[in-house]
């Protein structure tokens, strides 16, 4: 039995991500194998249900290969834990497990990420935000790999590097991590981290003081420029012009530029086409919301930092219902702790439901692209299948464009993701639809009314 489990675990460790293996396979315990039946114990109901649906077939296949006979795999709750369900025992078990959570499962909230003190002689890099402290999972592994490559070869790999995604997903952490590594490798490099709003203010100040020569001299002399939330440049033509000059100067000198945004470059409203084409000349990488395993690890580790312990059941309950970003998880944890302490109650699923009832009700109403497609199809009396088809008559094409527009406005999906959900269409098709419907809405009261009705229907 021991030999089988070692072989099975080794195989699964190769096939899964470290987060998946640590969260789902490592906690399992093989109980016995008799008459072609293999019994495996899970530490709680959440892990039991998830492993049965996600990994049962693979474990069954490995077992059949090992014993060379058909094998039935049964998953059960760990008998030892079932027999010892006292709260004190639970706290001890969770505390022990929390120590096994990797130390990099939390994304610290930078204390100076939006500090706008005008001190240009400092890099403004947050030393707490490093690659070691970064949360790693499937959602951000490509962005992290690109960031490490840039940190190791600034100015020669992926220039510019453009990271985009929703708030609280780790973009700011990654660009600070790059800055920290570059500084560690060469303390003499000239680095500047700046939020886009502060850059705009610097442009305004230079204009008021007639100091554009000093402004250009400073920004053009940097070795590494880190611009956060560049979508704030939208509609600000003078700021974009100055940034274009800085961009050209730095790229020509083989200096590194790293940019973050909450949206895909071509989706940034009011951005000069020249800049968008420059952004596209480097590497553009999406940072996605964290997957379930990462969210659980974040909650457990953060709870330990707060001096409390979560049962696995509670952590999985919260992680399954809150899916958007790390900051949302941290905010939810603070609400749970405050509610628990105020009412003098232990943290249970029922307490979590009470503490987060407003947040959970919003999550339960979360809008999906599939729901948008069905609602729009019903509204215009067409088939849902028409949303994915290649048909192009006006009575189908326009509802499809409206559905794409609503998907962009009401969900966190990127343009490529929306295109994939509309029959594998290219992201440029989605972008055209979004811009067209947005323009029509501004000009046509009838279009605006239709969209308003659809939005209210979807939001309930």
UniProtKB/Swiss-Prot annotation:
- PROSITE patterns assigned: DNAA (PS01008)
CDD domains to which the protein is assigned, alphabetical: AAA (cd00009), Bac_DnaA_C (cd06571)
Tell me how this protein assembles.
Oligomerizes as a right-handed, spiral filament on DNA at oriC.
Q: Which Gene3D superfamilies match?
A: 1.10.1750.10, 1.10.8.60, 3.30.300.180, P-loop containing nucleotide triphosphate hydrolases
Question: Domain comment text?
Answer: Domain I is involved in oligomerization and binding regulators, domain II is flexibile and of varying length in different bacteria, domain III forms the AAA+ region, while domain IV binds dsDNA.
The entry's ATP-binding residues are: 168, 170-172
Protein name (record) = Chromosomal replication initiator protein DnaA
Please state the protein's primary subcellular location: cytoplasm
Name where it's found: Cytoplasm
Family to which the UniProt record says this protein belongs: Belongs to the DnaA family.
SMART domains in alphabetical order: AAA, Bac_DnaA_C
Q: What does this protein do?
A: Plays an essential role in the initiation and regulation of chromosomal replication. ATP-DnaA binds to the origin of replication (oriC) to initiate formation of the DNA replication initiation complex once per cell cycle. Binds the DnaA box (a 9 base pair repeat at the origin) and separates the double-stranded (ds)DNA. Forms a right-handed helical filament on oriC DNA; dsDNA binds to the exterior of the filament while single-stranded (ss)DNA is stabiized in the filament's interior.
Q: Name one GO biological process term.
A: regulation of DNA replication
Q: Name one GO cellular component term.
A: cytoplasm
Q: Which UniProt keywords apply?
A: ATP-binding, Cytoplasm, DNA replication, DNA-binding, Lipid-binding, Nucleotide-binding
Q: Which NCBIfam families match?
A: DnaA
Q: Where do the segments described as Domain IV, binds dsDNA lie?
A: 341-460
Residue segments, region Domain I, interacts with DnaA modulators:
1-78
The gene that this protein is the product of is dnaA
Any one GO MF annotation of this record: ATP binding
Q: Where is this region: Domain III, AAA+ region?
A: 124-340
Look up the signal peptide feature and give its range: none
Extract the ranges annotated as region (Domain II): 78-123
């Amino acid at each position: 039995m021991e030999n089988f489990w070692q072989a099975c675990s080794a195989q699964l460790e190769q096939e899964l991500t470290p987060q998946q293996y640590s969260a789902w396979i490592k906690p399992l315990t093989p109980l016995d194998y008799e008459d072609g039946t293999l019994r495996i114990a899970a530490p709680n109901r959440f892990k039991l249900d998830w492993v049965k649906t996600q990994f049962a077939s693979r474990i069954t296949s490995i077992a059949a290969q090992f014993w060379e006979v058909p094998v039935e795999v049964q998953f059960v709750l760990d008998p030892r834990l079932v027999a010892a369900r006292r709260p004190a025992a639970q706290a001890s078990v969770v505390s022990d497990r929390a120590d096994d959570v990797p130390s990099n499962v939390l994304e610290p909230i930078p204390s100076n990420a939006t500090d706008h003190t005008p001190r240009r002689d400092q890099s403004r890099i947050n030393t707490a935000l490093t690659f070691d402290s970064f949360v790693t999972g499937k959602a951000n592994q490509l962005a992290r790999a690109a960031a490490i490559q840039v940190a190791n070869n600034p100015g020669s790999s992926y220039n510019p590097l453009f990271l985009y995604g929703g708030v609280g997903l780790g973009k700011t952490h990654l660009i600070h991590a790059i800055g920290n590594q570059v500084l560690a490798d060469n303390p003499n490099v000239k680095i500047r981290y700046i939020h886009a709003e502060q850059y705009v203010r610097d442009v305004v100040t230079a204009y008021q003081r007639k100091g554009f020569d000093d402004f250009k001299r400073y920004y053009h002399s940097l070795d590494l420029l880190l611009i956060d939330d560049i979508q704030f440049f939208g509609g600000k033509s003078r700021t974009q012009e100055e940034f274009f000059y800085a961009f050209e100067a730095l790229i020509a000198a083989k200096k590194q530029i790293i940019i973050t945004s909450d949206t895909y470059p071509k989706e940034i409203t009011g951005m000069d086409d020249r800049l968008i084409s420059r952004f596209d000349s480097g590497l553009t990488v999406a940072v996605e919301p964290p997957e379930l395993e990462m969210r659980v690890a974040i909650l457990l580790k953060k709870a330990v930092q707060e001096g409390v312990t979560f049962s696995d059941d509670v952590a999985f309950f919260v992680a399954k219902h809150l899916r958007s970003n790390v900051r949302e998880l941290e905010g939810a944890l603070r609400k749970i702790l405050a509610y628990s302490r105020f009412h003098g109650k232990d943290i249970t699923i029922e307490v979590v439901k009470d503490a987060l009832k407003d947040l959970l009700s919003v999550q339960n109403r979360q809008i999906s692209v599939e729901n948008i497609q069905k609602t729009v199809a019903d509204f215009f009396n067409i088939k849902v299948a028409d949303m994915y088809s290649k048909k192009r008559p006006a009575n189908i094409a326009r509802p499809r464009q409206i559905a794409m527009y609503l998907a962009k406005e009401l969900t966190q999906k990127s343009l490529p993701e929306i295109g994939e959900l509309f029959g594998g269409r290219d992201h440029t098709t989605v972008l055209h639809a979004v811009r067209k419907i947005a323009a029509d809405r501004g000009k046509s009261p009838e279009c605006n009314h239709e969209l308003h009705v659809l939005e209210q229907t979807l939001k309930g």
